[in-house]
Amino acid sequence: ITVAVPPKLQHLYTAEQPGLLTLPFQTSDDFSAILKDNRKSGILVGPGSGINQTTHDIVLAAAKVGRRIVLDADALTVFQENPDELFRAITGSECVLTPHEGEFSRLFRFTGDKLTRARKAAELCGVVVLLKGSDTVIASPDGRAFINVNAPPTLSTAGTGDVLAGTILVLLVQGMPALEAACAGVWLNAKAAAMFGYG
């Protein structure tokens, strides 16, 4: 696992974990250069990225290289003005979107129950959509959907969604299909939260 990060923030990632691999990047072109290394078999964009043009361009660059992708947080919100641009870029790929209700509503205008909305969203964008909450719904473009039932209240702690996104990516790059990786990631995340509690 390598964390691509602006140079001015590298020390934040390596201070307590000197063995953590980091690569500096300033622009989306720098990020695209990192993606030329085929050993980078999966890409997570979103947590802490910022809602800006660089995040927008990084998402599109990641989608273009055809690797496994998880998009969370800012990587979703940055497309709120033009969600179709995101959907065109990712449709049919091994990609998982992990929005909470607020992020979901910025991309999709569906009404109805959570299960129906998640299914419609997955069908529309052509990838797995994981709509987070106490009853997280994981939906596939083919209509299959699952509802997680083991979520403890400790998952409302900041950062648990980032951990979830990373867990899903780890499963994806090991060859697990997107729907199964999302389901397993949600279950593992909830189980860990129940075991370790808040913090």
Feature roles, as predicted:
Residues 1-70, 77-96, 101-199:
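Small-residue (G/A/S/T)-rich helix-start motifs and N-terminal tracts that mark the onset
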